Amino acid sequence: MDDELRERVRRAAERAALFNALKHGSDAQVGAIMGPMMGEHPDFRAHGDEIPGVIAPVIEDVNGMSDDEQRARLAELAPEDVEELDSEDEGDDHALPALPNAEAYDEVRMRCAPNPNGPWHVGHARMPSVIGTYKQRYDGSFVVRFDDTDPETKRPDLDAYDQILEDLSYLGFEADEVLTASDRVETYYEHARRLIGMGGAYTCSCPGAEFSDLKNSGEACPHRDKDPETVADEFEAMVDGEYNSGEMVLRVKTDITHKNPALRDWVAFRMVDTPHPRDAASGYRCWPMLDFQSGVDDHRTGVTHIIRGIDLQDSAKRQRFLYEYFGWEYPEVVHWGHVQLDAYDVAMSTSTIKERIAAGELEGWDDPRAPTMQSIRRRGIRGAAVVDAMVELGTSSSDVELAMSAVYANNRDLVDDTAPRQFLVRDGFEARGEGPEESHEAVEVPVDDGPDEATPQVHPEHPDRGDREIPVGERVLVEATDLPAAGDRVWLKGYGPVRYDGERFAFLDADIDIVREEGVDVVQWVPAEHNVDVRLRTMDGDVTGYAEPGFADRDADEIVQFVRVGFARVDAHRDGGASVAYFTHP
């Protein structure tokens, strides 16, 4: 990052921190401003790993100001931001906008309706993050409904049902009610029969292309005026599985001349020859389309507010015809834009990830390169860090991009205080796929005249947690890039300053002022004779190296910080093999 860009980052951070602090009446946090700042300045994203360190002092300065000082400074930088603050309702400190007409309902009831055709990718976390936050805000209810009524095109994955609920729990939410649409097929049949009795639906055997031509020209197909008795008989034949796939559908009778062809006599039920993978639903061949199934379920389960993609606006319009037939009141709807994700080379698509796994290009859903919930969990990213970043995106109808650096900043705030420090000396890199090459090499150097043991702190901010005891021995390992020129000094962290003569380190003394006053580099190291082989799995490849001996005592799932490398989750210690850790973030 050059000086000009650094100054732009500082100025943008100052403005964002001032606005955030004044809006919420509390100290600004790095994680809270990273997402919006990255969204407003896309050119910052390439430097996402550096930005937290650049903006942290700026935010600290802002937090040290009084409210009046913050307001005056923001007026200098961005008077329009002050106007926006003045126009907002006093005391409204929510990241999300108020739900429409929430006060008109006894209880706000929202649903997350995943298709269980595979485990969740990171983008799937947006819906439960926002709905869960609204539930807390309005003391409402959170319904999870598995929309699994397409056994062919988006075939359900039997493992995904439980995996999705586990991901929901990881994010910090529990559903008040869990429903599975394929358990409710008889309910959809009942409503179809009612609709047929009203004259609101008809069976149609037109080939798809033929009906499409008629629909686009605003002409009714010859089946539209069938009497309800014939329609009822043919629908029962559909239910009994007497038609093959594509031979018969049930259509909702709307307006065949509607200005939007997508709303003209849409399909409510179709025949599917492929059995459902769930035993309880495997006998059905007549399946509702999502707009019919979802519309019925939203009413039957008392949903008051729906959040769905901007591309699904026609779904609401189609369902309103259904609601008018039944005399139901349609829920409030918020349409939002799509969310994109930076930092990954793999597309955020369930089908694409499945294909990459099947082809052997990914090792599984928890591969560090996969943009999936299982992957970020295994890396040690807390669910709350994801939720906060998703909520900060809001519910705008515009497409948004989630900067993973914002998730990392949130997570750093959550884990930094508790993560014990450890030394890791890297000594190799195994690239996976087309990831960038890295070069790491450990160098063994004899040490003369120093203490037998080093005692670095467990955590530099918490001296009360004690020290780590690391036996030094006769030789240490350092990374080749940290080796100084002959005659120069370095500070072996937790041990002391040494001078390198081109072959050996000679211990000098333990005066920390050498580092503070003379700019001596501080480097991590491990004893050459007493260390732990480590394989650190990253998004780009596997880093091999050596950790200090105490790493062997760290529990699986514990988050540590490898000094000058980054945070990592301890995955497993293996007898006779390397311990495995997953790189979390810098």
Swiss-Prot record:
Tell me what reaction this enzyme catalyses. Answer: tRNA(Glu) + L-glutamate + ATP = L-glutamyl-tRNA(Glu) + AMP + diphosphate
Locate the motif 'HIGH' region: 114-124
Organism of derivation: Halobacterium salinarum (strain ATCC 29341 / DSM 671 / R1)
List where Basic and acidic residues composition bias occurs: 431-443, 459-468
Q: Please name the SUPFAM superfamilies in this protein's record.
A: Nucleotidylyl transferase, Ribosomal protein L25-like
Highest rank taxon of the organism: Archaea
Q: Which GO terms describe its cellular component?
A: cytosol
Can you name this protein? Glutamate--tRNA ligase
User: Where do the coiled-coil regions begin and end?
Assistant: none
Q: Which HAMAP family match?
A: Glu_tRNA_synth_type2 (MF_02076)
Q: Function, please?
A: Catalyzes the attachment of glutamate to tRNA(Glu) in a two-step reaction: glutamate is first activated by ATP to form Glu-AMP and then transferred to the acceptor end of tRNA(Glu).
Sorted alphabetically, which InterPro entries does this protein's record hold?
A: Gln/Glu-tRNA_Ligase, Glu-tRNA-synth_arc/euk, Glu/Gln-tRNA-synth, Glu/Gln-tRNA-synth_Ib_cat-dom, Glu/Gln-tRNA-synth_Ib_codon-bd, Rbsml_bL25/Gln-tRNA_synth_N, Ribosomal_bL25/Gln-tRNA_synth, Rossmann-like_a/b/a_fold
What family classification does the UniProt entry report for this protein?
Belongs to the class-I aminoacyl-tRNA synthetase family. Glutamate--tRNA ligase type 2 subfamily.
Task: Extract the PANTHER family matched here.
Answer: GLUTAMATE--TRNA LIGASE, GLUTAMINE-TRNA LIGASE
What keywords are assigned to this protein? Aminoacyl-tRNA synthetase, ATP-binding, Cytoplasm, Ligase, Nucleotide-binding, Protein biosynthesis
Any keyword Chloroplast? no
Q: One GO BP annotation here?
A: glutamyl-tRNA aminoacylation
EC number in record: 6.1.1.17
Enzyme class, one word? ligase
The places in or outside the cell where this protein is found are: Cytoplasm
Principal place of residence: cytoplasm
**Single GO molecular function:** ATP binding
Pfam family of this protein, just one?
tRNA-synt_1c_C2
Entry-linked NCBIfam families: gltX_arch (TIGR00463), PRK04156.1 (NF003169)
Please give the residue ranges the record annotates as the region Disordered.
Answer: 431-468
